[in-house]
């Protein structure tokens, strides 16, 4: 049998990290078993579902590279199929119409609560004969009264729920819209899903859905219910912890490889290994190795992974992601070095691509002012001679290379009988406007001869004005 998994988000908000991790686990289980991965949009909550949220989910999945083999399917386009199955269930007696008013249901629950009983539907309409009436009704699934539901969860082991703990689930509301728990069952059946990977908040739904599957004569998939992600304070991850949509991580400068690597380790491990490529994960990942304990989100660990991938991935690939940030920060990359050169030069220092983009601006744009603190420290009167001499030697340099630039810096220091720092730091501030950059010879090379000379001349004027003021 072909392994077939699915990710089935509701488009009522962005794709958050918990959902992304669930999608990743489901995707990996399919890929590890040469199976198929289905994307399904569960949009039966018509009032809360939005196209914007749906687009955000698709964008997030695409950015992460979690490609799907089927879909996206939309539940709102399958209402005819759900209604067809409901009619069959009514005919077979595995579902029934319930005419109980909202007031009666509320009164029933209040009585049950007062008696310390479990609050569930009492089956008032369960055995009523069909009647011709205009009264509003819902349709309920006739849940078995005896026995229990037993299933072996990949994460939590054997789970058993007595049927007398389950009530007769509403599968179609008074407005004619089929309910989530029912649509999920029909979809998983029709789509041939063999393993359902989802959050632990769905555990209570599972026995209900299994009973409906049994009533339909449908195969029962395997299940894996993964634990929630916590904030560093032990509470459920939420916006106050900085929990955001997946695309916000893109906007903040993270590579998809870093986020995927981080998410897979939030609950799954393979020895002490921390770094995993997607190809490795396709071989190593097993649902049974997922830890059932909740995992805490650690932003510092994510940053560490991001730094690793910025430094270790192909600069051409990193540059393709960096371009988005350059555009976002309105840096025109046509007026300067190739982005791959920037990645190679700056990757050792950068924590995020957003930071890398911001720190590379001086390679593409001239600046109006020098950093005040750096200028005060390094663009003093003593800097005038090394700046002037270097600029003179620079004009005589025909072969513009890192090695030759380095030789000119050394020659300037030697001729003036000063340390390299006495030449290097004024030059660095002169050409970058600040005090940090890659190696000075590489920095000058990437900025270019003409632009470097212009900036050094500007610094010479700045120092001269400072001396004369």
Swiss-Prot record:
One Gene Ontology term from the biological process aspect of the record: glutamyl-tRNA aminoacylation
Subcellular location: Cytoplasm
Span of the annotated motif 'HIGH' region: 9-19
Enzyme class, UniProt record, top EC level: ligase
Record EC number: 6.1.1.17
Keyword terms, alphabetized: Aminoacyl-tRNA synthetase, ATP-binding, Cytoplasm, Ligase, Nucleotide-binding, Protein biosynthesis
Known role: Catalyzes the attachment of glutamate to tRNA(Glu) in a two-step reaction: glutamate is first activated by ATP to form Glu-AMP and then transferred to the acceptor end of tRNA(Glu).
Quaternary state and interactors: Monomer.
Protein name: Glutamate--tRNA ligase
Species of origin: Shewanella frigidimarina (strain NCIMB 400)
Species classification: Bacteria, Pseudomonadati, Pseudomonadota, Gammaproteobacteria, Alteromonadales
Annotated gene: gltX
């Amino acid at each position: 049998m072909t392994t077939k998994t699915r990710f089935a988000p509701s488009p009522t908000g962005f794709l958050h990290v918990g959902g992304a991790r669930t999608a990743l686990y489901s995707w990996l289980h399919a890929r590890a078993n040469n199976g198929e991965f289905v994307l399904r949009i569960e949009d039966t909550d018509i009032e809360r579902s939005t196209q914007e949220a749906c687009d955000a989910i698709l964008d997030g999945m695409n950015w992460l590279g979690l490609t799907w083999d089927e879909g996206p399917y939309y539940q709102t386009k399958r209402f005819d199929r759900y209604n067809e199955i409901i009619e069959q269930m009514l005919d077979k007696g595995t579902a029934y119409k319930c005419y109980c008013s909202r007031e009666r249901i509320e009164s029933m629950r209040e009585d049950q609560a007062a008696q310390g009983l479990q609050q569930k539907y009492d089956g008032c309409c369960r055995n009523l004969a069909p009647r011709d009436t205009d009264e509003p009704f819902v349709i309920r699934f006739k849940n078995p009264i005896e026995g229990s539901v037993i299933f072996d969860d990949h994460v939590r082991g054997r789970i058993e729920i007595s049927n007398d703990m389950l009530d007769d689930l509403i599968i179609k509301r008074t407005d004619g819209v089929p309910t989530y728990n029912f649509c999920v069952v029909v979809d998983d059946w029709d789509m041939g899903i063999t393993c359902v990977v989802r959050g632990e908040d769905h555990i209570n739904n599972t026995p209900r859905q299994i009973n409906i599957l049994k009533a339909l004569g449908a195969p029962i998939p395997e299940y894996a219910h993964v634990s929630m992600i916590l904030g560093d304070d032990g509470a459920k991850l939420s916006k106050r912890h900085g929990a955001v949509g997946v695309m916000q991580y893109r906007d903040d400068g993270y590579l998809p490889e870093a986020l995927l690597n981080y998410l897979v380790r939030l609950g799954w491990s393979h020895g002490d290994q921390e770094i995993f490529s997607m190809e490795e994960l396709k071989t190593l990942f097993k649902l049974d190795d997922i830890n059932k304990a909740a995992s805490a989100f650690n932003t510092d660990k994510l940053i560490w992974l991001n730094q690793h991938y910025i430094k270790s991935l192909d600069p051409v690939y990193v540059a393709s992601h960096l371009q988005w940030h350059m555009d976002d920060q309105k840096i025109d990359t046509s007026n300067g070095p190739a982005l791959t050169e920037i990645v190679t030069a700056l990757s050792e220092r950068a924590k995020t691509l957003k930071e890398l983009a911001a720190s590379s601006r001086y390679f593409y744009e001239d600046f109006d002012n020098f950093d005040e603190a750096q200028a005060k420290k390094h663009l003093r009167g003593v800097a005038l001679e090394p700046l002037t001499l270097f600029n003179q030697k620079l004009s005589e340099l025909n072969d513009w290379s890192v090695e030759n630039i380095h030789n000119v810096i050394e020659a300037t220091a030697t001729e003036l009988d000063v340390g390299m720092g006495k030449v290097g730091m004024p030059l660095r501030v002169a050409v970058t406007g600040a005090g940090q950059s890659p190696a000075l010879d590489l920095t000058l090379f990437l900025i270019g001869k003409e632009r470097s000379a212009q900036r050094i001349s500007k610094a010479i004027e700045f120092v001269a004005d400072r001396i004369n003021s």
